[in-house]
């Protein structure tokens, strides 16, 4: 397994990061099987594991913690906070109040006294970034966290966070975790260049585009009836995306590779990508992914991929890496109705 430096942290991580979102009720409910998969990945050279408190509402972190007993020192362990964790208005988000509470829960479930990489899971429009960075800085100084990062942030918020850290003498975000795949290349426009500018490590999620780049889901073919497919079925309504998959399948076949291996090699070929997160649900899926870990693509193949999905573009609006709240929330685009009525 190839090793790469995680930004400027000095930490070396594997080119594949084991993602655990589908360990537990969100995919594979057999905890022992999930533990065996984690051990298999470690035995095959993967030293980077990513999870989150919200995955399975704490179930997944507990599985990871069980698997790492006796092997903690082998792993660069990353987790995330910010998602809603039960009842109550303050059990989520990026406030200091929640950050210091969330990390204690993660440490307990993971069975460790420190987290290598603690990440803000999503943008939080209700909390000043200085509030969050100040709390995270205290965690680093307390030895509970080694490095801090973000996930799903737009380029503007990454820049703002770097500026605030420098101005206030706070620890910097050292990584970003965006979605990136052949079908979702929007981050090549701003996010990846910004990460390069500030020396951030980049771990990308969904390099297989929610499974579309496995070749399992074909145009005009029956769709599997399972919980995961029901969750991502909205991504199968875009004919342009399915057309691209057919072209990519042909390209992969001509090159003598599976589409899965082609897609993973594409994601790790970008010079600003440190590690690509794999999310296997079964041991067979994990073994197949690891088999292709050494594949690299030549310029001829990458040029053909560019012709199918041009650099910096997405196929379909559902793949946009970050949609500002100013677009999704009408209250941020329209004055209150009573004000508009009074102005008539």
Task: List where the protein language model places each region.
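N-terminal binding-site loop/beta-alpha segment at the start of enzyme catalytic domains
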Residues: 1-76, 343-344
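Short, well-ordered coil/turn segments that N-cap beta-strands
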Residues: 11-16, 45-47, 71-75, 111-116, ...
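Glycine/proline-rich, positively charged
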Residues: 26-27, 86-186, 190
């Amino acid at each position: 397994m190839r090793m790469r430096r995680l930004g400027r942290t000095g930490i070396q991580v594997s080119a594949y990061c084991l993602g655990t979102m589908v360990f537990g009720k969100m995919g594979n409910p057999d905890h022992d099987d999930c533990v065996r998969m984690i051990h298999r990945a470690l035995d095959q050279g993967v030293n980077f594991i990513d999870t989150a408190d919200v995955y399975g509402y704490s179930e997944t972190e507990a599985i990871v913690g069980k698997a790492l007993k006796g092997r903690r020192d082998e792993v660069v362990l990353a987790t995330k906070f910010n998602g809603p964790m039960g009842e109550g208005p303050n059990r989520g988000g990026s406030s200091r109040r929640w950050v210091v509470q969330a990390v204690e829960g993660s440490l307990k479930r993971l069975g460790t006294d420190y987290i290598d990489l603690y990440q803000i899971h999503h943008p939080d429009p209700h909390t000043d970034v200085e509030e969050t960075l100040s709390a995270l800085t205290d965690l680093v100084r307390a030895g509970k966290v080694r490095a801090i990062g973000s996930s799903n942030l737009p380029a503007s918020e990454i820049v703002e966070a770097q500026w605030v850290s420098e101005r206030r003498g706070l620890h910097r975000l050292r990584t970003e975790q965006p979605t990136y795949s052949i079908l979702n290349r929007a981050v090549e426009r701003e996010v990846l260049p910004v990460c390069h500018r500030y020396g951030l490590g980049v771990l990308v999620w969904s390099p297989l585009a929610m499974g579309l780049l496995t070749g399992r889901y074909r145009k005009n073919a029956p769709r599997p009836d399972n919980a995961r497919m029901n969750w991502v079925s909205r991504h199968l309504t875009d004919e342009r995306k399915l057309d691209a998959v057919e072209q990519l399948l042909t390209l992969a076949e001509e090159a003598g590779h599976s589409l899965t291996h082609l897609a993973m090699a594409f994601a790790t070929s970008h010079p600003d990508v440190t590690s690509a997160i794999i999310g296997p649900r079964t041991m067979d899926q994990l073994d197949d992914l690891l088999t292709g870990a050494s594949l690299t693509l030549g310029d001829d193949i990458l040029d053909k991929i560019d012709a199918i999905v041009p650099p910096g573009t997405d196929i379909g609006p559902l793949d946009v890496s970050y949609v500002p709240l100013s677009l999704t929330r009408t209250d941020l685009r329209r004055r209150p109705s009573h004000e508009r009525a009074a102005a008539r």
